[in-house]
């Protein structure tokens, strides 16, 4: 399989699918009331965009339903930044993914529903035996739903390919979500299904070119 760039999903692909829902979401939810009473201008600007009376309740509802809301994603990034910086959060990136990102012969890009800010934080504070590891120097660029669109729409992948200056058929996209892979494939991108512990079983997984370890790439 020849490709000129790799586009990676995060949750369920380079780190356990449980990390977001069992670590990041609970950390954020504990800060919702404090967030809603914040006098920070950036936070206030984001909160007013919800245009609802019960902002805290609305935020909790979005998180509970795992809605990919762009305003929510930005707020989460702001809250998680504090958690990463004070050592409460470390990202459990798979060892084989760390090795692949550090040693890839082609540019590595990230595409996640989480904000670009949250993505950079995750890769800046990767859990390692020596406290934390910063993978940002090895990642060429980041894309999210604000910059590129929803991950289940083919137009999003066309935008990314255009942005990186590589034809879609020269990009390999790896994700645990078959709907995302279907969307990417429409543009001509090469695709692989990430099969990791805890991921949902995918029907007809073989047709999605499954990979269980990035050492096999």
Swiss-Prot record:
Coiled coil: none annotated. It catalyses: 5-methylsulfanyl-2,3-dioxopentyl phosphate + H2O = 1,2-dihydroxy-5-(methylsulfanyl)pent-1-en-3-one + phosphate. Disulfide bonds: none annotated. GO terms for cellular component: cytoplasm; nucleus. InterPro entries: Enolase-ppase_E1, ENOPH1_eukaryotes, HAD-like_sf, HAD_sf. It comes from the Eukaryota. GO terms for molecular function: acireductone synthase activity; magnesium ion binding. Mg(2+) binds at residues 9, 11, 176. Binds 1 Mg(2+) ion per subunit. Its cofactor is Mg(2+). Keywords: Amino-acid biosynthesis, Cytoplasm, Hydrolase, Magnesium, Metal-binding, Methionine biosynthesis, Nucleus. Substrate binds at residues 112-113, 151. Pathway: Amino-acid biosynthesis; L-methionine biosynthesis via salvage pathway; L-methionine from S-methyl-5-thio-alpha-D-ribose 1-phosphate: step 3/6; Amino-acid biosynthesis; L-methionine biosynthesis via salvage pathway; L-methionine from S-methyl-5-thio-alpha-D-ribose 1-phosphate: step 4/6. Pfam families: Hydrolase. One of its GO terms (biological process) is L-methionine salvage from methylthioadenosine. Bifunctional enzyme that catalyzes the enolization of 2,3-diketo-5-methylthiopentyl-1-phosphate (DK-MTP-1-P) into the intermediate 2-hydroxy-3-keto-5-methylthiopentenyl-1-phosphate (HK-MTPenyl-1-P), which is then dephosphorylated to form the acireductone 1,2-dihydroxy-3-keto-5-methylthiopentene (DHK-MTPene). NCBIfam families: enolase-ppase. This is Enolase-phosphatase E1. It comes from Lachancea thermotolerans (strain ATCC 56472 / CBS 6340 / NRRL Y-8284). The gene is UTR4.
